Structures are given as structure tokens and as C-alpha cells.
Amino acid sequence: MTEFVFPLTGVEKARLRAGLEAAFTIPIIDDVEDFVWEALFHYVKNIPLPDPITQGRTKQLFDAVASDGRGWSLKTLVSRNFTVGSSFEFVIQRANIFQKAAQLGFPEGLNSSSDIANLGAALIRHWNEKHQRDCIAQNVTDPPIVILLKNRLRKRLAYVEFAYPILQEADYRWRWSREGGFGLQGWKDEQVHLKWYPSGTQLFQVFQMPENAYYFELEWQKATLSNFVENVIRTLAE
């Protein structure tokens, strides 16, 4: 399995379910992702939500930051397979290590024919630079990552929260997914944890579903648009 998993408290589970049911009911929201998920997560953890209009949004790593030093990177994925041990992945960074080779400690340059260990080391350094830079900028000392997995109908979901430290170069072995340099894979503990494709410079991180993920089901129905708007206006007028 992957890194250490943090469980939700009973109160947080209740807030997660309530927040998701409320969000999916709203007819002007097409899905829970991006800022909608960020806002709901602030509700789950009971931390202040910055106003995206007056305070803006950033491309920094941590989408929610608490005053105690915790900072969460938040992801959502639509998944068909929620079984324990199943893999899921997402892009964490565009890593153009060929262009930044000297900056990453390879002054002689890098290309797809370079030593595979050097390519892997460059990828980890590229990611760690962003991780460490954003930790400092956002005052984060405890960095988890949270993934909300949803089935197609958004009725069956799973929540998992992993520790999210920087990567260690010595932990990984590297190999091409097939001859010709199509995709580079970073292996750790006999499993693929990183994937990188030179053509698009995208770096993916791969996780395995842990035994103690929080699985749950929701029952919700979209409100009609007119009822939703009228109820909001009525509530604001009270």
C-alpha cells in the first residue's frame, strides 16, 4: 500500500456526507470538483474558506490550509473500481526535465536517451522543488493529500487522506513502459508509483486504494432550478 492514511472523525464523516448531498442537489452545479470540492473540504475540516472573488485563487500545491500548519492537496476522480488495492492516478505536474536539466543537477543535459536513473532523479527533484517551495510559501508543515473518488452516478464514493511528504530518490527504480522511451515508470515496493511521458512532460502519481478508506453511499436528487433559486432568495431575505 501507499503512505500512511489519516482517518476522518465521526463529525467529519457526517459533514462530508451532508456537504456532498447538498452540493449534488444544487442544479447549477454539474459536479463536485475543483473549487466546489475545495469549498466542501473547508466545511468538512471546519476551517475558514477564502473568498475566490476578493482573494483570488492560486496554482499552489495546497488547496486548503489550516492555521496549525496542515495543508491539503485536494483531488477528485471518477472511478469504476473502488476495491482495496486497485490503482488510480492523476497528473501532479508538468515536468519538462530536458529544458531544466542544469537546474536539476545535470549540467550536461538530459534527453530520452540519457541514463534512466538520471531521468528519474530529475523528475523527483523537479517535483520536490515545487513541494518544498509551496510548503514554505503557504506555511505548511504537515502536508496530506486527499482524494475523493466517485462512481459515474455520484451515489457511491470513497474518501482517502494520505500523508504527502517529499519523494526520496533512493526509494525508486526506473524502467520504460516499453522499448522506445514511451513512458517512464517509477517503481517502489514492487508497484508503480510514478509515470512520466516525455511527449507531454506530464508526471502522474499512482496510488493504491487502502483498506481503511472511507466508503459511503449517498441518496440525493437534483432540485428544480426555479425551486432552488426561489429558496435561496427567500433564505437571504429572512
Regions inferred by a protein language model and the residue ranges of each:
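Short acidic loop-to-beta-strand element that houses the catalytic metal-binding Asp/Glu
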Residues: 58-71
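Nucleic-acid endonuclease domains
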Residues: 1-60, 76-238
